Structure formats: C-alpha cells, structure tokens
Design a protein with these regions (language model features):
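A residue-identity detector for tryptophan
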Residues: 3, 10, 35, 57-59, ...
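Charged, amphipathic alpha-helical stretches
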Residues: 1-64
Length: 310
C-alpha cells in the first residue's frame, strides 16, 4: 500500500475519473475514501487523510501494523513524499464503507429515466439500509446519518420516491402527447446533471424540447421531460443562449413547461438563424455526454448485478 504526500495531505490509491459523478465517496473521521463507480465491490479505495489525529480508526481497515507504520512514517520529518506499508485489509469493513459510498452515489446520481427504463429507487429503503450499514462502522464514520433529501426543484439536493415500473409507461405516454413542434424552428438539448436536482428531469439524453412560435407574440416554448408524473419542475431556470449571448430566460412550471418571450418582432423571428441556439436548463455546468453515458451504462449493470452492493 503506497502513501503519497500531495498538497499537504497523505493519500493512497488512484482514481481514474476526474468528473465528480463518476466517483463514489464516503467521508470518515479524518479521511475521505473514494472509488471509481465501476470498480468491484471490494476494490481498494483512494484514501486521503484530512486529519491524522481524527483518523485513529485506520487500523480497523488496513490492520494495526500498517496503521502504526503509517503514523511513524508520516510523522517522520526525514520521510520523503512517498512510502509503502503492508496493509492487511479487513474485507467486511471495506465492504461496509464501499456500501456507504455506493448508497450516497445512488441518492445523488442514479439516472432515473422513464424513456431508458431506469426506475426510481426506494428512498425509504435506501435510507434504512445505509443507516444499518453505518452502524457496522460507527467508530469510523462517527455521527454519520444517511437521510433522504428534500423534494425541491430549486436546490441541488437529491430526492427519490418509490414508483412501480408500470407507471413509467404512463409517464412516457403522457410526454409523447404533450411533445411540442414548431412552425419556425425546433430543437432539443441535454442539461448537465450536475446543474439539476436529481430525479426531477428524465435522465435520458435530450430531454429538453423547444420550438419557436411567431404568433401572436414571438416566444420560445420549452417542454422538459420530467422523471415521472410526481416530479415537479417548478422553479428551474431556463436560458436561451446563442454563444455567450443570452436571448431570453424564464422558469419552468411544475409540469416542466415554459413559454419565454423573445423580445423580437415577427419579422425578426423569421430572419433569425436558430441553428446555433442552445436552451440551458438548470445551473450552467460543463459536463460531457460521455460522463452521462458512463453513468447510464453503470446503472444498467447495477440493475442486473447480484453482488453484495445490490
């Protein structure tokens, strides 16, 4: 087990991904433990020590000899920026910590989608299970309390409600009925998941439909596909952009709809080039489609998985 000093903190292990949604993490006393989302259940985490005194539980995870060796080496003023210890991993403790990280990731990033067939998870069941797991490692995550988040569309808290799979067909049918097309120009866009509250907008690609309407007053109508019929999009900000220029902005109603005045005459609307217009929903966050695709692929794997993380 190799420890490396970086930015004043000792850390071990490697994380392949830099994008936050692709990392599962749990905060322990005096340390942060992180895994790539697609690593096996008992993979070794990257451990970053944030407080050496608080991290007095480390022996429970890597064994007492390795912990003693770490403390002696880390506190040695002549020690270089890296050293190795012989860890003897406690696999049950490792699995419990990974479960906590996995559960927090599920709460924050599970890609609920009626279109893609990814159902919502039971929030109450997840909270109950994660708090039971936390009790197994209470000396490591002292004071840890896994809780469901508030169901609000104007914060970045993550929420989840239990929903039968049969409801998704109804949701998808409703969305198709209210799909919008326009006489001048129409388009679609994909919001950044990191800029949205979880489980409000359907996690399929391009859930935002928009079209330009010229009469009686020029507007841009926006319909966002919500995660299910109980989701509430009210208050989510929408911006109509052409490059850095903001053409218009507004807010969704609870159905995920907004009609945004363009401030143009009918003639000006017809003369505009709409091909480079982007409709942004939520907070402006740089995020690639590849990140979302990786999460969708991981979710499909988890739906089929039969390991101890399930």
């Amino acid at each position: 087990m190799k420890w490396t000093l970086k930015d004043g903190a000792w850390s071990s292990g490697v994380i392949s991904f830099s994008e936050f949604p692709l990392i599962q993490a749990v905060e322990a006393r005096g340390a942060l433990l992180e895994w790539n989302i697609d690593e096996p259940e008992r993979s070794r985490p990257r451990i970053t020590i944030t407080d050496e005194d608080e991290c007095d539980w480390l022996w429970e995870l890597i064994g007492e000899p390795a912990h003693v060796e770490f403390v002696q080496s880390a506190q040695n003023p002549n020690m270089r920026k890296a050293f190795n210890v012989a860890a003897q991993w406690n696999l049950e403790t490792l699995l419990a910590l990974r479960k906590l990280a996995h559960g927090q990731w599920l709460r924050d990033w599970w890609p609920t989608s009626a279109v893609d067939g990814v159902p919502k998870l039971s929030d109450e069941g997840l909270v109950r299970e994660m708090n039971d797991v936390a009790m197994q490692v209470e000396t490591i995550v002292d004071g840890y309390q896994f809780s469901r988040t508030e169901d609000t569309s104007v914060s970045l808290n993550r929420t989840r409600d239990n929903q039968a799979q049969s409801d998704y067909a109804l949701v998808a049918g409703t969305v198709q009925e209210c799909a919008i097309t326009g006489p001048i120009f129409s388009g679609t866009s994909s919001p950044a998941w990191q800029g949205l509250p979880a489980h409000v907008v359907d996690a399929t690609e391009n859930p935002v439909q928009w079209h330009v309407e010229a009469a009686p007053n020029p507007v841009l109508d926006i319909q966002v596909l919500l995660a299910d019929k109980q989701s509430n999009g009210e208050g989510l900000e929408v911006r109509v952009l052409r490059g850095p220029e903001e053409l218009a902005h507004g807010y969704l109603d609870k159905r995920g709809f907004a009609s945004v005045p363009l401030g143009l005459t009918v003639a000006e609307v017809w003369l505009q080039d709409w091909t480079d217009v982007v409709v942004q929903v939520g907070v402006d966050v740089k995020e690639s489609q590849e990140v979302r695709n990786r999460i969708r692929a991981f979710a499909q794997e988890r739906l089929r998985a039969r390991d101890r993380l399930s």
